Curated annotation (Swiss-Prot):
It comes from Arabidopsis thaliana. Its EC number is 2.4.1.-. InterPro entries: UDP_glucos_trans (IPR002213). The lineage of its organism: Eukaryota, Viridiplantae, Streptophyta, Embryophyta, Tracheophyta. Belongs to the UDP-glycosyltransferase family. This is UDP-glycosyltransferase 76E6. Transmembrane segments: none annotated. UDP-alpha-D-glucose binds at residues 274, 333-335, 350-358, 372-375. It comes from the Eukaryota.
Length: 449
């Protein structure tokens, strides 16, 4: 590593996934603007586009991670993949920090690591370096992990066979019920609960930073600080604190030109994130329902997101023609710009936390189609607490798709949701202005370091 300027350096360790890398790089940009140099430690298989988007950052690759190619995620599943990363990366990360300290002197102000990269805690302890945990998910999701870590997987499975237990409210997490806890779609429960215990273990960390906003999750933030016993800083929405291009996927900006030709608040934007896969039959039902709604739509279909297909070549030609009459399909969109476009009236989303925050910041109400884990928690909050969206559950069929789009874009109920979303939009934007809760939290973090 080259000798850097005489200013304190922060080491960032993100999870190798779009939804984690994006807010971590936004955090790095915010701290860089406060005078810190930024070093990003990444694996061989999760390269961030450093030369293009972050020329002022230093990027270091952990050695010996070639044994964990991306295909391992598909084979192991998310929980076991994270265990494997933490097992194989601890020693090489320590070597990385040791080499850095030898070459550049004791200029590391702090190691900030994604909550899933908890192997960093051992290096922070060994070299007596301050560390801070960063969560890219909601505070409510964090609190739910505090609940799960105290449970027995075997007993939980038995208890959840009782419908009454399923509907029981989780203490201090209203309206969350036990059946809403993020346990689905991630593999065996015993390993999930073990991972929750590792994540919630603060080790030697002096604080937790969360990409959320106090006005959205004040009760969960208070509960989390009580559970962890260290300061919890709500620093979001990070994407409006800074403007940092950090997408790992190439964005198709042609859709903005298409949006320019549409009427205000008429378009439904559909994007189910960077991971979700759908069956061809579901995509066909979705396409017909969108067409029948008589509303223009912008639809993100990632390559590989239709099971068994490279992209949309498996769809019948008449469906492609039908979609092109009323809609526009891209492989990936500049989502923040799309949501802020005056033509967009609603967002059909998987309810990942980044997408949820980005939609609220633009005052766009949502159709919630969560698939697993924390997405279901976010959808519950959108529907039952903030009341700026509604869930569509069960089998995807054209009639349900058509009704959902009309409910959001055309009906009075959708207009009411939009009004509430616009109020939240102003609250979130106020949080990052001088004197706002997130603005003040960033100042406190800088002083902490």
């Amino acid at each position: 590593m080259e000798k850097m300027e005489e200013k304190k350096r922060i080491v960032l360790v993100p999870v190798p996934a779009q939804r984690h890398v994006t807010p971590m790089m936004q955090l790095g940009t915010a701290l860089n603007m406060k005078g810190f140099s930024i070093t990003v430690v990444e694996g061989q298989f999760n390269k961030v586009s450093s030369s293009q988007n972050f020329p002022g950052f230093q990027f270091v690759t952990i050695p010996d991670t070639e044994s964990l190619p991306e295909s391992v995620l598909e084979r192991l599943g998310p929980v076991e993949f994270l265990f494997e990363i933490n097992k194989t990366s601890e020693a090489s990360f320590k070597d990385c920090i040791r080499q850095s300290l030898l070459q550049q002197g004791n200029d590391i102000a702090c190691i900030i690591y994604d909550e899933y990269m908890y192997f960093c805690g051992a290096a922070a302890k060994e070299f007596n370096l301050p560390s801070v945990i960063f969560s890219t998910q909601s505070a409510t999701n964090q609190v739910s992990r505090c609940v799960l870590r105290k449970l027995s997987a075997e007993k939980f499975l038995v208890d959840m066979e009782d419908p009454e237990v399923q509907e029981t409210l989780v203490e201090n997490l209203h309206p969350l019920r036990y059946k809403d806890l993020p346990t689905s779609g991630v593999g065996p429960l015993d390993r999930l609960f073990e991972l929750c215990r590792e994540i919630v273990n603060k080790r030697t960390a002096s604080a937790v930073i969360i990409n959320t906003v106090r006005c959205l999750e004040s009760s969960s933030l208070k509960r989390l600080q009580h559970e962890l016993g260290i300061p919890v800083y709500a620093l979001g929405p990070l994407h409006i604190t800074v403007s940092a291009a950090s997408s790992l996927l190439e964005e198709d900006r042609s859709c903005v030109e298409w949006l320019n030709k549409q009427k205000p608040r008429s378009v439904v934007y559909i994007s189910l994130g960077s991971v979700v896969q759908m069956e061809t039959k579901e995509v066909l039902e979705m396409a017909r329902g969108l067409f029948n709604s008589n509303q223009p739509f912008l639809w993100v279909i990632r390559p590989g997101s239709i099971a068994g297909s490279e992209w949309i070549e498996s769809l019948p030609e008449e469906v492609i023609k039908m979609v092109s009459e009323r809609g526009y399909i891209v492989k990936w969109a500049p989502q923040i710009e799309v949501l802020g476009h005056p033509a967009v009236g609603g967002f059909w989303s998987h309810c990942g936390w980044n997408s949820t925050l980005e939609s609220i910041v633009e005052g766009v109400p949502m159709i919630c189609r969560p698939f697993h884990g924390e997405q279901k928690l976010n959808a519950l909050c959108l529907e039952s607490i903030w009341r700026i969206g509604f869930q569509v559950q069960g089998k995807v069929e054209r009639g349900g798709v058509e009704r959902a789009v009309k409910r959001l874009i055309v009906d009075e109920e959708g207009a009411d949701m939009r009004e509430r979303a616009l109020v939240l939009k102003e609250n979130l934007k106020a949080s990052v202005r001088n004197g706002g809760s997130s603005y003040n939290a960033l100042e406190e973090i800088v002083n902490l370091m």
